[in-house]
Each structure stands twice: as C-alpha cells, then as structure tokens.
Amino acid sequence: MARDFSLKNTRNIGIMAHIDAGKTTTTERILYYTGRIHKIGETHEGASQMDWMEQEQDRGITITSAATTAQWDGHRVNIIDTPGHVDFTVEVERSLRVLDGAVTVLDAQSGVEPQTETVWRQATTYGVPRIVFVNKMDKLGANFDYSVSTLHDRLDANAAPIQLPIGAEDEFEAIIDLVEMKCFKYTNDLGTEIDEIEIPEDHKERAEEARSNLIEAVAETNDELMEKYLGDEEISVAELKNAIRQATTDVEFYPVLCGTAFKNKGVQLMLNAVIDYLPSPLDVKPIVGHRAENPEEEVIAKPDDSAEFAALAFKVMTDPYVGKLTFFRVYSGTLTSGSYIKNSTKDKRERVGRLLQMHANSRQEIDTVYSGDIAAAVGLKDTGTGDTLCGEKNDIILESMEFPEPVIHLSVEPKSKADQDKMTQALVKLQEEDPTFHAHTDEETGQVIIGGMGELHLDILVDRMKKEFNVECNVGAPMVSYRETFKQSAQVQGKFSRQSGGRGQYGDVHIEFTPNETGAGFEFENSIVGGVVPREYIPSVEAGLKDAMENGVLAGYPLIDVKAKLFDGSYHDVDSSEMAFKIAASLALKEAAKKCDPVILEPMMKVTIEMPEEYMGDIMGDVTARRGRVDGMEPRGNAQVVNAYVPLSEMFGYATSLRSNTQGRGTYTMYFDHYAEVPKSIADDIIKKNKGE
C-alpha cells in the first residue's frame, strides 16, 4: 500500500508548556479543526480527548503523552501532547527525543514560567526547532508584548512575533499576519468563520515596525536577507517565509504567534505556521546510530522508505483492550504488521502483531508504517523505552535515552494477602511503562520500596495501582540504607568451646581486622601455616564472618570495606566442627567491634541543581543546612548550576523545598555516589532508634 502523505508533507510535533498554560486545550482545538473530533472537550470539565487516563481527568493535568495524528492542508501532522508538571519531565524527554519540531505554549498573562524554562532547556539539548504560541489572549491581564519579552529575558531566545493581536482580554478580536501583512477577524464562536480584512489604519504603523523587527531578527541568521535589509531592498513574502523556515529549522530563530485556544481564535493560523516553518523529517539532520557488533562504527538512518528499517521505541503502555502497546518513531525503511523484527538493543527477535495509528485513546489499525511515521505496535514482548527496533539483517543501535534516577523512595505494602500477587504484577507493568519508576524489595527490611521523580509522581502511581490493577496498599515513609565499617586495625581472638556431655564444640581463631579502601568491600585472607586450623574449616571461618557482618556491630546495618586475615588458631580432633568455627569467627567480629572504632556510614548523593542566578544564595544556604558540601558552580546559558554532595537522609522533601526556594524555576537531579561517615551526634541517634531506646 502506498503512503498517504509524502515525507515532505509530514510533521512530527510536540506541544509543550508549563502546567496550566492551555496546552491540552490547544491540542483539542487542533484535533477539532483538522476534523478528528466533532465536539470539543474542555480540560476543566474533565472531558478532554487527549487526557484519557482517569487520573488525568480527575486532576485536569496531562500525565502521559498521548500521541495522535491529524491532517491539515494536505499534510500529516503527528502530535504528541506532553505533560507540563516537573514530576513528569521524563514524558517530555521521551517525546522530544522523537520529534522534529515543537509548539511551545505560553500563558499570555504569565509569559515564560518555570516549567517552560525546563522543557525549553530539554528541547535545546535535543536540538528541537520551536514555534511559540502565546495562548489565553482573552484572559484578564493578557499581555502579548510582556510574554515576548520573557522569551528574551528568561530564555535568551532569538524570538520575534510573526503575528500581532488586535486587542486583548475581552477585546481580543483579530490577528495581524506580519509576513503577508494581512489581518484575520473571527466572526463566530467556534472560530470556523474567519474574515480576511485590511489592517486597520490605527494598527498599520505598529504592524510595519513589528515586521521590520521580524526581518532584522531573521536576517541575523541569513546573510542574503541581511544584505537586502541593509540595502533597503524589497523582501518578498516567499523570501521571508523561506528565511524564517530555514532559521527555525536550524534552531536559530523562534517565530511567535498569538491566540486563544479556549475561545477558538488563532489555532488554524498556528497550524499553518506548523506547516510553513517546522521541519519535515527530510529537513532535520538524519539520526546517527552505531553497529551493535562494533560501537565505533557509525551508521546513518536515512529518512527513506527503501532503506533498512530502523525505529526507536519511545513509550510503552498497557492498554485496557489490546494489552501492551509500544509507541515508536520510524527513522528509516518501512514495517508491515505480522512481520518479524529485531530489538538490537537487547538482541531479541520480536513479532509485530498489529500496527495502530493512535488518536488519543482510540485507534485505527494500519498495515504499514513508513519512515517518518509515529505509530504503536501490539505484540512486542521484550521491548522497553529507548530500545532500537530494526530489520532482522540490520544491527544498528540508535542513540538511546538517558533517564534520571528516582529521587524519592517510599515503602508500599499490600493491605491483604490477595493484593500481594496483584501488586507484584502492577509494579512490573508500571516499571515497563515508566523508566523513572523503580521498585525493589529491600533485603534488610523486606519492604517493597518504590522510587520516582517526585511526590506527585509516586502519588499517581499508587493511585494507578488502585484504579487500574485493583491493588489496595499502605504507603509508608522512606528509609535510608545505612552501612557500618571499621576505622582502626586490631588483632582479636574468637574462641567457642562448649562441653555438655558427649561430643562438645570447639573452634578457636585469631584474626587481624583492618579497614579496607572505600568501595572495596570485604576481603578475607588465610595465612594459616602448619595446619593449626585445618583446611576444611577455613571456608567456615569466612562464612561465619560474612554472616555476622550482614547484621553489623553497632546498629544492625551491614559492615562493609573491611579486611580480615586469619593468622592463628587451634582445634580439637573430636569436638571441632564447621559450625564451631563459624561461631568462633562471629565472636571474633564482636571482639573487634570493641577495638576497631566502628562507625556508621550513610549514602551520599551527587546533587546537581540548576536555577536562575538570583536564587543562588538561598540554594547554597539550603545545601549547607542539609549537611551538604558544595563541589563547584558553573554558568549554563542564563542559569547557574551547583554541584554538591548531600546525605540522602537530608534530601527527603527537597523537590518541594527547591520549588519554594526558586518559585518553581529550579530543577535538580541526584544519584548515589559513595558512602561517608555519619557525624557522631546523628550516629548516636540512629543507634538509639535501632535498639529501641
């Protein structure tokens, strides 16, 4: 079957913004005007097409990025609606990885907001071209000029309006197109009737000045245009459009548009801009991968239907009707349903059961997907987020996605025995869907610990376990896994002797304990000569030490980074046994605890905090108050980055604290780095607590 839309006429775009900027409503209107839906659903009524999870409709926020496809002006537009909440940045990262362009939605009253900065930085990392849609022009306090100025001040972006609004708030009634110098007036509530009129006299001067600013901003990226501009030559509409398109595709310029999705104004013109200025898969740099067999050898996945098939899986989700759905972006070649492909990341063969074109949560079955398409596959068993899919003879691995480690952990336990198995299944499925969600059983406490990107993230996952998997569970407070070690060396004896009629028990060992290097773990050395401890009992001595070290010597935490050298001992022909030497070794460790200066260690996290410079003082003070050590600072764009080491026990609730300290404009990542000694006063508290004092 031939493709419906050429690659040149395909657009893969994301809609991204701060929470509540009107992103989902904007997507809804796109679907309405492109004929995909017949009734418009409002987010605040909980009936939006793109927000299809129950939790999303309850909270009125977008959690998962629903993918949908629409047609406009002879083009196919694949749209991914991304969440704007900081706890769901992984969804934004996933989407940006597979998009060719994006529409950044701003609230006309607030302009660039904290989460806009975060997603903008992510889009810059992935080199995604953007256009900006200043939404909510009908809102009280809407200010287009202010919104544009925040793009310059907060993002340092080379952005300029390609449209101007006529009026604002209740008076917002028309839009001036600065490229073609036309004016569009809306005449009905649904925004389907638009009159093209002359630019009103009292707005002409303002429009001409804005057009001149637009040409100047674009000319900075285009020598040919700059020459014409400086020579006062006439610049045609076609020349200006081409220059804007080129500069936008090169991520050197960001066109700014205006409208109100809620009141149905400006969305069709924004769709025209998507077609005119955002790139097709042919206009962006082809993705570079490497050979699975030889990571040094680069392979280019060209956007060409006749090339070898290569795609990237960017999202896995469980669908209530068809089971596991794998969303993927095709970079080269084609794929037909029912065929076999290779997951080159995991070196597994997969069969594609069915191929689906997604529309929020409804779907249409298709036979073939082509290069540049975004679709979902049913039947892939081993494929996870970030995996490369390719033809069976191909062995390309596309650059995968890196996801941050969880920053908050909680314990969960099922309320009843019946919930136990269901909870295990639910956790497996949720981890498949979300690479930033981790679950494991703590061997020391036996608790199931879940980790995620923030309180809201885990709150929603626990909620999903309840609603989708019918699992009731209790959520506890998180706990830190401490460790213990020795700071001094000592030689000690461990002797176990018991006579109680009949055969007795006898084992005697002399062991030298010394601190080992950080991270080196436990090392056992046997230096017995002359058989004072028979060879068959040596493994029992080592096993006895290992068992005893699991429970520590101070507060019940595992003892790590210690060397033990068995250098002397004695035995009894009749009474000695493996068990006796095991016990003797554990007694030696108890004795060492009195002489080797044992201490408690805590996990230290490497924390990287990014925020606008004005919050630097507050952040540094907060890090110090949390017993943190600042390791360096560096500027990044118009933000500052602080690197620090902070104890994990001090990092709980940090997301909330950072949000309030930076008015939501800071972001952070953290991961485990090493174990370090706990200050004595805190260690004493831990010991008391664990001994139940």
UniProtKB/Swiss-Prot annotation:
GTP binds at residues 17-24, 81-85, 135-138. Keywords: Cytoplasm, Elongation factor, GTP-binding, Nucleotide-binding, Protein biosynthesis. GO terms for cellular component: cytoplasm. One of its GO terms (biological process) is ribosome disassembly. One of its GO terms (molecular function) is GTPase activity. It holds the Pfam family EFG_IV. Belongs to the TRAFAC class translation factor GTPase superfamily. Classic translation factor GTPase family. EF-G/EF-2 subfamily. This is Elongation factor G. It comes from Staphylococcus haemolyticus (strain JCSC1435). The lineage of its organism: Bacteria, Bacillati, Bacillota, Bacilli, Bacillales.
